[in-house]
Amino acid sequence: MTDQFDKTEKQYIELTSGIQRFEHFSVYTDPFLPQIFSHNFVQLHRTFPLDKLLPFFSSVPGMLQANYIHVKAAPEHAFPLLLKQNLVKQGCVVEDELFFARKLENRDLQAGHPLTAWGTEKSLADGSSIMNIYDALYIGEAAAEQKLERKYPLYKDGTVMLVVCYSDASQTIPIGCGELFINKADKTAKIEEVAILDQFQRKGYGSILMNELMAAAKLNGMETVYLVTSGMDGVNRFYEKLGFKRFRRVHTIFHYFLT
């Protein structure tokens, strides 16, 4: 990992996950949140031979100490069609993580939108609350509470900024939030965990929240901001409208075992 995005991504992941490095891959695990897949995975190095991938899978659950396989290919890896077909036949889900980035020279990025807040006790409480509510809908209440307990110290000490979006300027009802992680050395920020409650989506709140996240990054001296998303066309078009451009595609493989 040599460029600014790799460095920032590594720093962000290691806030919650420990790492074991091997010759052709690294293992990231979070013993406090083994059920959160983004905290637990095997990252292949570019030197990993793809013809060894299928036999390698049998050892992954043991490495992760989990009942699932979660493997991320190196950016340099391009899976042949036959490999993808064989993975699917074995019950694996093969998806792409897409990396988007944009520069922050835009003079229109001004922090302080009346529907957003960050850096205060109230915004910390509101952001934590809405993050917990959103996560509970998708990963369950118990996992959501454990995740918040794990990440709350990072929010409280400012290691990760929590930007909140409200339904109106009274800032009474929080409806969404997003994380901002800053890599000061490389002047690069990562936007993560962007969430707007379903009933408030497609009403402009997502753009307001994203613009505030970018403005906050710019205010903190960042020159570039990036995020990682899935291959969903609608989501990708949303980020492209905000000035982001895709610069990387990474294959991910997942297989969950019921027993």
Set out the residue ranges of the language-model regions.
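Acyl-donor-binding surface of acyltransferase catalytic domains
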Residues: 50-122, 253-255
